Design a protein with these regions (language model features):
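Extracellular glycoside hydrolase catalytic/binding regions
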Residues: 3-121, 125-129, 134-163, 168-170
């Protein structure tokens, strides 16, 4: 709900999310992802003022680009996690937030280690052939022949390290 709010305050995002959650819960108890201020980089602002979900199945989103973001953004997410909020990294990229530049393996490894430490689920940007540094596939890729970009190769190497079995998380 509300992907990448730019400058809206949490109170406004929360009010909107509560209305949408009430409608969704009439039909489904599936996980709902809720955005937060500054392009989903301030999930900690929801501590003590969480959205209302009768199914207790909400996660707060977090976005980063390894070439742009660092310790400050990780700190915001860590505050949220330590404050008891479930976090889902619903967008991360290997390059810069503007889509330019090339992946920095060292900065990306710092972020991957951080996600592993907190056992965070994530979705990488972008499994596409778009003309930007974070695209996973080169323009010559086809459905039959995938050609990975440097970003795609890096993401593929991270995904290859994922566990093949999982444990259920503790619930409140």
């Amino acid at each position: 709900i509300f992907n990448e709010p730019k400058s809206q305050p949490w109170t406004e995002i929360r009010e909107y999310a509560n209305q949408i959650i009430a409608v969704i819960r009439q039909y489904s108890d599936n996980l709902i992802l809720v955005g937060n201020p500054n392009w989903d980089q301030k999930p900690h602002v929801a501590i003590g003022n969480e959205v209302e979900d009768p199914a207790h199945n909400v996660a707060y989103t977090f976005h980063y680009y390894a070439g742009t973001h660092g310790k400050w953004e990780r700190g915001n997410a860590e505050k949220a996690i330590k404050g008891g909020l479930p976090i889902f990294v619903s967008e991360w990229g290997t390059g810069t937030a503007d889509g330019k530049g090339t992946p920095d393996p060292e900065k990306n490894q710092v972020w991957q280690d951080w996600m592993d430490e907190y056992k965070l689920s994530s979705a990488n940007w972008s499994a596409s052939r778009i003309n930007e540094g974070s695209a996973a596939f080169a323009n010559e890729s086809t459905l039959d022949t995938l050609v990975f970009t440097p970003s795609g190769e890096l993401v593929k190497s991270f995904l290859a390290k994922n566990p093949d079995t999982y444990e259920a998380c503790a619930t409140k």
